[in-house]
Amino acid sequence: MLAPYACQPGESRGRQQPESMSTFRSPFQRDRDRIIHSSAFRRLKHKTQVFVEHEGDYYRTRLTHSIEVAQVARTISGVLGLNTDLAECIALAHDLGHTPFGHTGEDALAKLMEPYGGFDHNAQAMRIVTRLERHYAEFDGLNLTWESLEGIAKHNGPVEGPLPYALAEANAQWDLELHTYASAEAQVAAIADDVAYSHHDLHDGLRSGLFTEDDLMELPVTAPAFAEVDALYPGLEPMRRRHEALRRVFGRMVEDVIAVAQGRLEAAQPKSVEEIRQMGATVIRFSKPLYQELKVIRSFLFHRMYRAPSVMKERAKVTAVVNDLFPLFMRQPELLPQEWRRDVEAAEDETTLARIVADYVAGMTDRFALQEHARLCG
């Protein structure tokens, strides 16, 4: 049974293009399924976060990360009496707008797009689900419910200041109330992202040799976890020791979020999702002590992993790929695939063309971007 402050499927604000109700699935289940079956979601399999795709098969991709985020979101939302289908839907959609080569690719594309309104992966996710997916006979995009669109747009909180063009375009059509906080389900999806990447970046960094278990014995959160495992399982083989310690870190993060949320919900006693939106602060968050400890972990990961010499070397290589491909397609848009030509021919100015090229480049997988760069740029 859903809590009164959860998003109730029967009270959805609906879709831009009206559709008949499904016999077997709720509106949010249909949204989730449409995301899973989208081309953009499938492409996440070959988009990486930190490590370049061809570096190894073990490391997380955007797809595996999104699945992990969805799992965490379902767990937390279920305990809190929230709509698990909506939380899962937003979690699965949150990375759809990412470029090839992780944040490195986004930084390069954003710089190239500065004269044309900029580029932001969160806004690009909105552009994908409202415009770029073209599989349905009656509409462009996925025709998601208002609640799913709100969650994608605002899962990190109210959106203030100048809007990225993709988000401004969507908001003009749907009025996503960007000045308010999002539903609790969207807030859960956001913090599930924090939990998942903090956990798996520790895993991947250890696996890659960028740091060791001894390094983690010096840090908050991880040090107590390793100490507990060593006390319970003396002499445990290294891989099992690592896994047991990091699953405790993972568990502590999830349990902390649930405990804090339960306390805040009990204190506020919200009677509807609208009261959640108007609370003036997030209801789903880490406790202050754990948040401070996780800041230490993130600082460690930033210096030892995200800015490691081997990673920085790859950053330079893949930045060059984006920096070469974007201006090439701007000069010669006829190089774009046939299905993109209609949009190119309809482009009325350079800004519109740049946004089409950015859509195409952002949609590339790591592997395809490297292949196209080798083919077109030698």
UniProtKB/Swiss-Prot annotation:
Q: Where is this region: Disordered?
A: 1-28
Q: Where is the composition biased (Polar residues)?
A: 15-26
Cite the PROSITE patterns for this sequence.
Answer: HD
Superkingdom, taxonomy of origin: Bacteria
Gene Ontology molecular function, alphabetical: dGTPase activity
Which keywords appear in this protein's UniProt record, sorted alphabetically? Hydrolase
Signal peptide annotation = none
Q: Which GO terms describe its biological process?
A: dGTP catabolic process
Locate the HD domain: which residues? 62-198
InterPro entries assigned to the protein according to its UniProt record, in alphabetical order = dGTPase, dGTPase-like, dNTPase_2, HD/PDEase_dom, HD_domain, PHydrolase_assoc_dom
- Please report which protein family the annotation says this sequence is part of: Belongs to the dGTPase family. Type 2 subfamily.
Checking PANTHER family in the record gives: DEOXYGUANOSINETRIPHOSPHATE TRIPHOSPHOHYDROLASE-LIKE PROTEIN, DEOXYNUCLEOSIDE TRIPHOSPHATE TRIPHOSPHOHYDROLASE
Name of the featured protein: Deoxyguanosinetriphosphate triphosphohydrolase-like protein
